[in-house]
Structures are given as structure tokens and as C-alpha cells.
Amino acid sequence: SPENNDTVKINTGALSETYVFNWGKAESGLGSPITYTIVFDKPDGDFSNPIWSKASDNSGSNAMVTLTLGELQEIYNAAGASGVASVKWNVKVENGSPNIKYGQVANSLNWHLVVLALEILH
């Protein structure tokens, strides 16, 4: 979650409140630990140079990340929009091996191309 085309309203008076993103857990065929990084990009981006990223909860080991509304405001600002900003998010999955490509790391890798609208409330 969130679902496609969800709108998150960012209350600038409550920037410490949180919003949770979660996804299906990946498994490494090598038995090595999996780490996750959530990445955000503009709707026309390809995630090669995301506008914002953060390791998931528990130092990257959980299949979820808890972001504050302040962090969502950073993403909103990085999107360079005013009014409602549309962004998409994805999850980068790694197992620590530089020789393993994404498709080989996990047998249940979920790529999220979710469009999310962020709106600032004053």
C-alpha cells in the first residue's frame, strides 16, 4: 500500500505524523539477508535517478517503511510541484552481492509503480 492514485494530504502543522508504505516480502535464493530501499520518482521517471529514497524500517530489513509527513513534504518539494504533486514509488531489493542482478536476487520481487498524489494543507 498505498493503492494507485491515492492522495496523501500533508498537514504542515503535523509533520511528525506518519504514513506507512508496505509491499510483499522478497526471499533470497542464496539465503543471504535482503534489504529494501523505497524510491520515489516523477511520473515520467525510470528510477535510475530517483528524486528521494530511504532504507525500509529496521535498517532496511522490513518490507515496509514508515515515513513522517515531513519526509513526504520533502518528496513533494523534490517533485517540484505546487498544488497536487504526482509521484510514483518503487522498491529496490538487494541481497548484498554485487554480482547478482535484480531479477536473480529474489523469487518474489514486487515492483511497485504506484502513482501517488501529495497535497500540502496549510
Go through each PLM region and give its residues.
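An aromatic-rich alpha-helical recognition segment common to small helix-rich domains
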Residues: 23, 38, 89-91
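Short, surface-exposed loop and linker segments with low hydrophobicity and enrichment for Pro/Ser/Thr
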Residues: 24-33, 77-84
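Aromatic sugar-binding surface patches on proteins
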Residues: 59-77
